């Protein structure tokens, strides 16, 4: 009996000891919340255009804002989504400038503007820190008077403030960058598609590597290469050769090596800067040898494809318009003419040639002409008929003003572009006037203006590749002609008056 009682007491004491021990164990600590700063400063600068990009242009749509995390649907939107999926991440918006008026029709950014917005970002980082990481949504083709490599300079200044924490950068496919940027940042991710469908995806990738790096699960190592090639934007579409094959090669490396990120920027040829041209940037998890091997492979491949880029030819204005009219007469409507070389938006070469060759049922979408808009607003209302000169004055390659005798079909504010006017003239012809360069990418642009684009014979767009999103890949366009009219965005890069680019870059200087 005593033995049984003893055993029971011993068992109870043993169980109590277990309960006591478990109760005394320290409650597991929750993983520390991660705090990441998010900023944006983005511009694609066509340095050959006549008008500098000033503070006034940057603040046309409003002053700098910290609300970028809630309003962005591209890189920052993807970054935010991935952070939410990981959990335990707090994002802090940093005072960032909005998009500049005129976009890439603006020339050199003034040093005053660059310093104002860079200093604003740096000051916010100082005052709102400390942070565990910094995410910068940049473009890569920014050009600033007096600052040769502005994005790299921005990242260096951020580094000086935040110290040795991860700085992750996203760039546009048209970026002009080199090792100075990758030396200052920890990881760089570049859009792989043109049209740029994957900005959201690149933001997600940036967040994944950022969080893994902060938690010690990833150690980003980079390799950067410059193949020494510049290419016209009109030939950089990733749905056609050779850009398609180059991007497929990059994706193949990523498939073979999980955790490796291979980025290619084809560059922006219309910025006269020292780091112009294609760039390859590879991020690996602590594997420099692999990063170097992949970067060398992609860079060498781009160099081997250089003549495919340079060998492409486009019809000049007269031939291109004749081809478009013939296609329309054959029933391949709507015919799309891509007036790709017009970088200021006010060129009249295609409009003038359409009229000269007797084209009907066409629409110019759009023609930049603030002067004509002001005159029409003063003298006319919707339904009024008038005669007015349009276009042909924005730059030396804008052509001649074209006299239009027509009717005001639409007059009003439209999609934050300012006052927009549609002039109807001739046999169902239209020209859409806007106060700034407008790149129409989808057919729904025409709907609020009362234009049924499907019923047009010919539609002229001031675009290079982005229009393919809504007119080619949807099957809307019967046929497309890219017309090489005079302008600051030509297919023949040897025609541009470069001063600052490398003296061995292909095809401008290096011929073999």
Report residues per predicted region.
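Extended hydrophobic packing segments that form well-structured cores
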Residues: 93, 119, 303-306, 416-512
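Active-site histidine-anchored catalytic micro-motif
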Residues: 37, 42-44, 48-50, 58, ...
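Glycine-rich phosphate/diphosphate-binding loops that line cofactor/substrate pockets in enzymes
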Residues: 29-32, 85-86, 123-132, 320-335
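Cap/lid and interdomain-hinge subdomains that line or gate substrate/regulatory clefts
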Residues: 86-95, 142, 161, 168, ...
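Bacterial N-terminal signal peptides that target proteins for export
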Residues: 2-12
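N-terminal amphipathic/basic leader segments beginning at the initiator methionine
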Residues: 30-86
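Hard-cation-handling environments
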Residues: 34-36, 231-428, 432-434
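Bacterial Sec-dependent signal peptides at the C-terminal "C-region" and cleavage site
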Residues: 17-32
